Swiss-Prot record:
Protein name, entry field: Uncharacterized protein aq_2027
SUPFAM superfamilies xref list: HD-domain/PDEase-like, Nucleotide cyclase
Record-annotated HD-GYP domain positions: 1-192
UniProt domain GGDEF: residue ranges: 231-364
InterPro entries for the chain: Cyclic_di-GMP/3'3'-cGAMP_PDE, GGDEF_dom, HD/PDEase_dom, HD_GYP_dom, Nucleotide_cyclase, Rev_trsase/Diguanyl_cyclase
Organism, scientific name: Aquifex aeolicus (strain VF5)
Length: 364
């Protein structure tokens, strides 16, 4: 069993560092709940192995879905749900006890029958799977992702109680709350995925291939993270407001070249020299505390946002505008400074939406 567990930890860790940490913490929480319930040592081992393999099917999910930093679309969610059946197909012929396989097969089922893939309910769901569902969900609640904040320990415990009889077995929840109340959050597990592989993989999804800026998917989550950090920073928005006219006159290829030139100009005037792939790694790991460089996001067809942990001198921003005028395009920009001109995420979001609306854009 130990060899099997170690194999799956390494396999998952190489595919997605977050999933590895999620699995290790989930297994730890499941053990605590199982012991509180009075499971035998053999049952605990079966539960642990089931936890180690429960998400192995995610290695077959495309990066564009698995690593997405925002809520999945209904279509993407349907693909993500396949990880259960894919995982079972991957391991069903290995020497893994059926009780552990049941954890894999049924960990997404809900007590009220609204889960997947089979829609089982109540005690139709095997005991070990009912236990692991609670541990798995609790881990997700208390772990921060780029697109959501982590719930506090007490908030998560309260949610377990609120979902008793709906998502979770109401007879197990009191034991889970008692067991989990005695501890606090665990650190992320060690990431065995080589850094260069992570850079390539995440950059493939989050790096805009035309301009070299970070894709807009990461903009709002990063903005929220900077606000939550609580330290001063500056937000600058650049808009090429005559790009459509420019493209009609000079062609789309020339328009793409101009977009790239804008990012180059922003980098020269407003940003320190940094590998954007390193920046993406920091953003994905929520490691903004050590982020000392500006980050350029392409948030629309011709709009770019720059989040900087310092205020770029006004003349530097104006130099960007003048540089782009030499290339035949017109630039508008505005700056906001936290916590001087805004203090809340909703405030800056409203300003951004109004700006986009004013300029005839679709908005963010």
């Amino acid at each position: 069993m130990k060899l099997n567990a170690e194999f799956f930890i390494r396999l998952i860790g190489l595919r997605d560092a977050y999933t590895r940490g999620h699995t290790e913490r989930g297994v730890f929480y499941a053990q605590l709940i199982g012991k509180e319930l009075g499971l035998t040592s053999q049952e605990i081992e079966l539960l642990k192995l089931g936890g180690y393999i429960h998400d192995v099917g995610k290695v077959a999910i495309p990066d564009v879905i698995l690593l997405k930093p925002a809520k999945l679309t209904p279509e993407e969610y349907e693909i993500m749900k396949l990880h259960v059946e894919l995982g079972y197909e991957m391991v069903k012929d290995l020497e893994i006890p059926w009780e552990s396989l049941e954890v894999l097969l049924y960990h997404q089922e809900k007590y009220d029958g609204t889960g997947y893939p089979f829609g089982k309910k109540g005690e139709e769901i095997p005991l070990l799977a009912r236990i692991y569902t609670i541990a798995d969900s609790f881990e997700a609640m208390t772990t921060r992702r780029i697109y959501k904040r982590a719930k506090s320990w007490n908030e998560a415990l309260k949610e377990l109680e609120e979902l008793a009889g709906k998502q979770f077995d109401p007879d197990i929840v009191p034991y889970a709350v008692r067991a989990l109340s005695r501890i606090r959050a665990l650190p992320l597990g060690e990431n065995n995925c080589p850094l260069e592989i992570e850079k390539i993989r995440w950059s493939f999804y989050y790096l805009d291939s035309i301009t070299g800026a970070v894709k807009g998917d990461l903009f709002l989550p990063t903005l929220r993270a900077f606000i939550e950090k609580g330290e001063p920073f500056c937000l600058t928005l650049f808009d090429i407001y005559n790009l459509l006219e420019f493209n009609r006159k000079h062609g789309w290829e020339e328009g793409n070249r101009v977009l790239k030139k804008l990012v180059e100009a922003i980098n020269i005037q407003c940003c320190s020299a940094v590998d954007v792939k390193d920046v993406i790694i920091k953003l994905m790991k929520q490691d903004i505390l050590d982020l000392t460089s500006s980050v350029i996001f392409r948030i629309g067809g011709d709009e770019f946002a720059v989040i900087a942990p310092y205020i770029p001198p006004q003349e530097k921003v104006i130099n960007v505008v003048r540089t782009m005028e030499e290339h035949g395009v017109k630039i508008k920009f505005f700056q906001m400074q936290f916590p001087y001109t805004f203090t809340k995420y909703e405030e800056v979001l409203e300003v951004l939406r109004n700006f986009m609306k004013k300029e005839g854009k679709k908005g963010i």
